[in-house]
Amino acid sequence: MKRVLIIYTGGTIGMTRTENGYAPRAGYFRAALDAIPDLRAPEMPEWEFYELSPLLDSSNMTVREWNCIAELIAQKYDDYDGFVVLHGTDTMAYTASALSFMLDGLDKPVVLTGSQIPLCEIRSDGRDNLITALLIAGEGIVREVCLYFGGKLLRGNRATKYSADGLIAFVSPNYPSLAEAGISIKYNEAALLPRQEGGLKLQTCLLYTSDAADE
């Protein structure tokens, strides 16, 4: 059975209601996943869960977090067949693009996804986005960093956020979709990257501080 690591960074998909609006809460989302029986269906890949700390609204995502995500994938690369990164929508496309260059030689799926409506709400789009992202990561047909949202799988460094309130939140104006999910997941084979040789090479981003900039 294929094994997938879910990396939860924060974002709308795992937020809960608070007195001050929606906010992420440590430990909540892992328990929420256990309440979705379809995630353990026979056709699903085996998955494990890793929660970053602290959880972030993606508007606060920085190069430091990009390095953390990329380093975690590199550390776990030989243990899993694919990866799903749960992320807020505000900077999801930026993170996907950054990871596509940081994970040089990647030959496994890294699928970023999230939701416009929290999983705790009845109309959440998070359940379908997560389940389909897990299936894509487990199938291993796409071997690159990509972004799945609203029925479309997009190349990570070609995606851009299109809508703040629509469920089809991302588009790829300059490159075709890698796959579309309807009754089945249909891959656009001509758009996929070929297999990579030579193994994964991690390229971390430099962190610049104000002190360094003044030197």
Residue ranges and their predicted role:
Residues 2, 108, 143:
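Nucleotide donor/acceptor-binding cores
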Residues 86-107:
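Short Gly/Thr/Asp-enriched flexible loops that form oxyanion-binding sites at enzyme active sites
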Residues 208-215:
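Conserved small/polar residues in nucleotide/adenosyl-binding loops
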Residues 67-70, 74, 96, 100, ...:
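Predominant activation on well-ordered alpha-helical scaffold segments within soluble catalytic domains
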Residues 11-13, 87-93, 152-154:
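Gly/Ser/Thr-rich loops at beta-strand to alpha-helix junctions
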Residues 2-75, 157-207:
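N-terminal glycine-rich anion-binding loop in soluble enzyme alpha/beta folds
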